[in-house]
């Protein structure tokens, strides 16, 4: 493939935009460098870049585009909203309708509030939990990303009984000291941390199914134990379902797994591709939020008609019969084909899949926590990523990210992708 225009555009972008990208995950730094491909148009499961190259897209904008690009039902809803004015600064019927849809889909949401991003929704659930409990410390699991606010850009300390350290320049040590990080899927270290800090903990942040170091499911009974131990300590359980809500079923991962949190943060899929976030939970906790309570949260763009209309339309598409069964069927087909090609070409991989999302790790080890994901072969993934790009397959440029299927992918797309994987694995095998 020819990437001349993408390369020229990136060179120009570097003169005007920091790092040439508006989110570091779009850079090719994690896959060996080079100019990221600039896309010009998306339709269904496909992308076309500025050079005219066509791709089957498994990035799906890191998850939100579950109905494919430019879905006609969603596009019509956005267009209608735009024609009626995109921002009012007043209540609307659309926000009430959308809130009711979310509550019906996720029974743990007694009350909801709309914001503008997943980062905002997580940030606000933390504030609400602190207001409700009167405590300040937060717990999270290593490797789980909860947005770019100072509150959660925190790395693990030297052990579960130590406090966190900043995971970004500009995050004060004093804020990091309010966060305790423990390994995912490890009850003993969670218990050890709670034994020491539990009386100061306001809440624990949980990705019920991890999406930020690949697709990693909880061990049987792990989430139930988290609820038990955290509630015993007098703290709240917050589920970050920014990636997982409406991805695996119509509703949340909490409903798929049968475990109920106190608060839930939402984003990505629920906006149908437009900026959005939402949070909700138990009535008595949510009533801490202004104007009813002392926990302040506001937003000029929150609940804007365009995002509400897009979100409603997206959920209407996902309500249709057979949507999630199709995603699961295609996901299973893709996983099987990738594993067969790996065996054929003697490439060591592990695939973690849940329904229509999967991650390919270059390792033979089981991936159940961040340390295991971190120790996979990133150099091999980088080579694989660029080989797949040449084959017309668009993946996330990071070994940690998932492949996301959409309602618009077809069996023919999967068959071609498996063939492309085979050619990429053959090239990797030739250059071991």
UniProtKB/Swiss-Prot annotation:
Its cofactor is pyridoxal 5'-phosphate. Its EC number is 5.4.3.8. Keywords: Cytoplasm, Isomerase, Porphyrin biosynthesis, Pyridoxal phosphate. GO terms for cellular component: cytoplasm. It comes from the Bacteria. Transmembrane segments: none annotated. GO terms for biological process: protoporphyrinogen IX biosynthetic process. InterPro entries: 4pyrrol_synth_GluAld_NH2Trfase, Aminotrans_3, Aminotrans_3_PPA_site, PyrdxlP-dep_Trfase, PyrdxlP-dep_Trfase_major, PyrdxlP-dep_Trfase_small. The keyword Cytoplasm applies. It catalyses: (S)-4-amino-5-oxopentanoate = 5-aminolevulinate. It is found in: Cytoplasm. Signal peptide: none annotated. The keyword Cytoplasm applies. The modification N6-(pyridoxal phosphate)lysine is found at residue 268. GO terms for molecular function: glutamate-1-semialdehyde 2,1-aminomutase activity; pyridoxal phosphate binding; transaminase activity. Gene3D superfamilies: Aspartate Aminotransferase, domain 1, Type I PLP-dependent aspartate aminotransferase-like (Major domain). Pathway: Porphyrin-containing compound metabolism; protoporphyrin-IX biosynthesis; 5-aminolevulinate from L-glutamyl-tRNA(Glu): step 2/2. Homodimer. Belongs to the class-III pyridoxal-phosphate-dependent aminotransferase family. HemL subfamily. This is Glutamate-1-semialdehyde 2,1-aminomutase 1. It comes from Bacillus mycoides (strain KBAB4) (Bacillus weihenstephanensis). The lineage of its organism: Bacteria, Bacillati, Bacillota, Bacilli, Bacillales.
């Amino acid at each position: 493939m020819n990437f001349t225009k993408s390369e020229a555009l990136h060179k120009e972008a570097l003169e005007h935009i920091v790092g040439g990208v508006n989110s570091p995950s779009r850079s090719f730094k994690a896959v060996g460098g080079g100019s990221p491909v600039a896309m010009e148009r998306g339709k269904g499961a496909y992308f076309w870049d500025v050079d005219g190259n066509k791709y089957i897209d498994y990035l799906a904008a890191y998850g939100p585009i579950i109905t494919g690009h430019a879905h006609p039902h969603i596009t019509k809803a956005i267009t209608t909203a735009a024609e009626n004015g995109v921002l009012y600064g007043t209540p609307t019927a659309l926000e009430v309708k959308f809130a009711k849809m979310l509550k019906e889909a996720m029974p743990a949401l007694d009350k909801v509030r709309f914001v503008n991003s997943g980062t905002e929704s997580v940030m606000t659930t933390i504030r609400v939990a602190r207001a409700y409990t009167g405590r300040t410390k937060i717990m999270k699991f290593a490797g789980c990303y909860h947005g770019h606010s100072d509150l959660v850009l925190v790395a693990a300390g030297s052990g579960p009984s130590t406090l966190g350290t900043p995971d970004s320049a500009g995050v004060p040590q004093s804020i990091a000291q309010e966060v305790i990080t423990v390994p995912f899927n490890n009850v003993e270290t969670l218990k050890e941390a709670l034994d020491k800090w539990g009386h100061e903990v306001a809440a624990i942040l949980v990705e019920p199914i991890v999406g930020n170091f690949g697709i990693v499911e909880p061990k049987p009974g792990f989430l139930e134990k988290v609820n038990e131990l955290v509630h015993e300590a007098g703290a709240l359980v917050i589920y970050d379902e920014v990636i997982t809500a409406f991805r695996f079923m119509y509703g949340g991962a909490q409903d798929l797994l049968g475990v109920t949190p106190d608060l839930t943060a939402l984003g990505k899929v629920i906006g149908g591709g437009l900026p959005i976030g939402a949070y909700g939970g138990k009535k008595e906790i949510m009533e801490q939020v202004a104007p009813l309570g002392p926990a302040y949260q506001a937003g000029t763009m929150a609940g804007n008609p365009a995002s509400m209309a897009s979100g409603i339309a997206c959920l209407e598409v996902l309500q249709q019969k057979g949507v999630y069964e199709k995603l699961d069927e295609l996901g299973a087909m893709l996983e099987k084909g990738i594993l067969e090609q790996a065996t054929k070409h003697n490439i060591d991989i592990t695939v973690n899949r849940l329904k229509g999302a999967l991650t390919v790790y270059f390792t033979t080890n089981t991936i159940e926590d961040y340390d295991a994901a971190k120790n996979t072969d990133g150099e091999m993934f980088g080579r694989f990523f660029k080989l797949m790009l040449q084959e017309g397959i668009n993946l996330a440029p990071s070994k940690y990210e998932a492949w996301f299927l959409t309602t618009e992918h077809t069996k023919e797309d999967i068959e071609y992708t498996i063939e492309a994987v085979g050619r990429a694995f053959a090239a990797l095998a030739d250059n071991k």
